[in-house]
Amino acid sequence: MNATAEILMVEDNEDDIAVALWAFSKHNLQGRVEVVRDGQQALDRVLAQPLGQIKVILLDLRMPRVDGREVLRRLRADERTRTVPVVVVSSSSHADDIAACYRLGANSYVCKRYSTARAGEYLIDVVHYWVDLNRIPESPGQDQK
């Protein structure tokens, strides 16, 4: 467990994880990322974190134990995690999958890109926006900046 992780990547495909970690390392973000490999681990991890520490969740849809849609539904149903940004990162470009994720409260939906020229780099753009530019509500009791 990375106690300082701001980015939680929920992905079960080892190749996708390797590409993402390579891109994060290339941009000196590896210390800010934690990877979990199924939906139940994601829920356990998010609920164990102090509120506001995780700045974005990168969530795959098709995973063992608890799938991405159910993770999203549970995160949005819980007052503690309702405002944590969730970006669905999926190989599916089906309109039904995209619409379902937005209905469940996804903040964004990104289709995985497999081009070797920019493999993993699209995640850097996503993370830059959600971690460095976007602001989420502060947790109760935290000082406002």
Located regions from the model:
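Active-site residues of response regulator receiver
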Residues: 59-60, 90
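Conserved acidic segment of CheY-like receiver
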Residues: 4-25, 57
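Receiver (REC) domain active-site loop signature in two-component systems and cognate sites
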Residues: 63-66
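Acidic, metal-coordinating helix/loop segments flanking the phosphotransfer/catalytic sites
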Residues: 21, 35-56, 120
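His-Asp phosphorelay/catalytic-motif detector in bacterial-type signaling
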Residues: 3-4, 29-30, 52-56, 80-85
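C-terminal output helix
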Residues: 114-126, 135-140
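Short, glycine/charged-rich "phosphate-handling" switch motifs in NTP-dependent
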Residues: 107
